[in-house]
Amino acid sequence: MWIENTIVLVTGGARGLGEHLSRAFAQEGARVVVNYHSSDERARALVSELGEDRALAAQADVTDAQQVRDMVSRAREHFGAPITVAVNNALVDFSFNGDARPTLEHLTAENLTQQFQGAVVGALNVMQAVTPGMAEAGEGRIINIGTNLFQNPVVPYHDYTAAKAALLALTRTAAKDLGPQGITVNMISGGLLRTTDASAATPDEVFDFIAAGTPLGRVTTPEEFADTALFFASDWSRGVTGQNLVVDGGLVMD
């Protein structure tokens, strides 16, 4: 599977890291389904920029299975082919600001449930919607976006980190289940990225602290992170599944 003309779904693809992922795939010639929940204006502006023959703005709440199925059907009707690459990037609104996070003392089950719904249930809904088309095509790539925080919780975002750790477990069990159909499932785990919507509230001293802890001496960019998604979407990764690749400049070595 080469990326050119491949139908790629990026959930949460209109802003933040998702926008960089959508752009990266479009630059390689893919046809991109830019999913969004509430960022209608940004999604349509991005699609207009990428070209309406190459991109489709698709509103859906990924936590709603029926909305996801409808979105996948619309994408197939629009492009005339099934989605064969799905990037589960959508995130419940979250600000990476350690000063504003709930400490363990104040963490609630509702905090955990909200993040679990976005990260795990959302990814499950997407996988269930796209895998029939992938099986029909004889191949597919599912790429889940994780975090290095469950290996190195430099800031203890309890709810977000726990949900992403659960997503890693689902990544590996799904890889086992879907492998016979020619579908690979992998995770890319970044650290702090400079800069996305989610990290916009991060103080400069935190960026400096993270950069000082990496062999490269800098914070990873969204563009560098997106490059790894291109690898997992291509034939270069055809022998790789069930893996978690950390892209954080070497802050975590695992």
Per-region residue spans from a language model:
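A short, exposed helix-loop element centered on a Lys and neighboring polar residues
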Residues: 127-128, 172
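Short, small/polar-rich loop/turn modules that mediate ligand/substrate recognition or access, typified
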Residues: 179, 184, 240-242, 248
